[in-house]
C-alpha cells in the first residue's frame, strides 16, 4: 500500500514504515502529525485518485527529528572585474516516519 500526498509545496510517495525528510514543520519531536492533502492511495489493484484530493484520505506520521541539510554554496563571479561573492545556505528539515495510511 502506498500513497501520494502534498506537504511544503512538494509531492511525496510514501508507504507505511517509511522515513522521509520534509520541509520544516512547527511541531515537537515525538509528536504525531496528520496530512490531509492526499492525492492518491493505492492498495494492490485498488487505486483511488483524488480530484484534486482523495475524500477521507489521511496520512499519519510521527516526528523523528528536526535538523539542517548539507550546506549549499552560492557563488557569484564577475569576469575581469576582480569581484566575487560567496554565500552558504543550510535548509531546515523535519524527519518523519509514516505510521498509517487511511483512505
Swiss-Prot record:
The keyword rRNA-binding applies. GO terms for cellular component: cytoplasm; ribonucleoprotein complex; ribosome. It holds the Pfam family Ribosomal_L21p. One of its GO terms (molecular function) is rRNA binding. InterPro entries: bL21-like, bL21-like_sf, Ribosomal_bL21, Ribosomal_bL21_CS. Keywords: Ribonucleoprotein, Ribosomal protein, RNA-binding, rRNA-binding. One of its GO terms (biological process) is translation. Belongs to the bacterial ribosomal protein bL21 family. Part of the 50S ribosomal subunit. Contacts protein L20. This protein binds to 23S rRNA in the presence of protein L20. PANTHER family: 50S RIBOSOMAL PROTEIN L21 (PTHR21349), LARGE RIBOSOMAL SUBUNIT PROTEIN BL21M (PTHR21349:SF0). This is Large ribosomal subunit protein bL21. It comes from Vibrio parahaemolyticus serotype O3:K6 (strain RIMD 2210633).
